[in-house]
Amino acid sequence: MKKTATPKLRLLLSNDDGVYAKGLAILAKTLADLGEVDVVAPDRNRSGASNSLTLNAPLHIKNLENGMISVEGTPTDCVHLAITGVLPEMPDMVVAGINAGPNLGDDVWYSGTVAAAMEGRFLGLPALAVSLGGELFRYYETAAKVVYQLIQRIEKDPLPPSTILNINVPDLPYEELKGFEVTRLGTRHRAEPTIRQIDPRGHPIYWVGAAGPEQDSGPGTDFFAMNHHCVSITPLRVDLTHYEAFDQLASWVKRLEM
């Protein structure tokens, strides 16, 4: 009996560091063994763009010589356009990254990398965001290998509905990783103060202060896993409803007067 070949995946890759980022190129090359890889990414660095979607201006795209597609927009724009009109075929999964720098704790609220994955899930596809820890960014190949493994696992055991995975990988050789940990989001202390300066024309300008240091970073958190050289895998829900607050809110809503 002739065996039927297992259909290859069609993967959509995006990021927030821009279409020319090293992490994106390494990820695309590594995942090519799994199937067809389409890359649709911002034309420049869009870190911190969160879930912003361009609604009041047209978006220009450019087909690059390497086959990637550059979008004059945010990470969310890229994934939205790719899935709803730019790509000739629907992808099977969205992968965002590899981000240059971790997305831990409160970072996920601002991260364009996480937002790109979230947009994929909004549009009905399994999705994950992957970030490389540290500051030197030497081992993108490690993060790419981790993603390769996770995609193979997700194929066999799909993610729960309305869930994406936020993956953070230590900047280490693969053989030095201590394992995989399923984690919750930690928290940071309040951000550093805004920095006020004067421009050459005498006008005040402001720089957003640095992210605050780790606060809730104990066992079970994404911070803890990364600090102990483990890959952090945090499931994030698209549904932001705080169901545990329903009873409390219902009790005082009854006392409101119209």
From Swiss-Prot:
Name of the protein in question: 5'-nucleotidase SurE
Family note: Belongs to the SurE nucleotidase family.
NCBIfam families: PRK00346.1-3 (NF001489), PRK00346.1-4 (NF001490), surE (TIGR00087)
InterPro entries: SurE, SurE-like_Pase/nucleotidase, SurE-like_sf
Entry note: cofactor: Binds 1 divalent metal cation per subunit.
Keyword Metal-binding: yes
Swiss-Prot/TrEMBL catalytic activity: a ribonucleoside 5'-phosphate + H2O = a ribonucleoside + phosphate
Enzyme class, broadest EC rank: hydrolase
Protein function: Nucleotidase that shows phosphatase activity on nucleoside 5'-monophosphates.
Compartments, record wording: Cytoplasm
Gene encoding the protein: surE
Signal peptide stretch: none
Cofactor names: a divalent metal cation
One cellular component (GO) term of this entry: cytoplasm
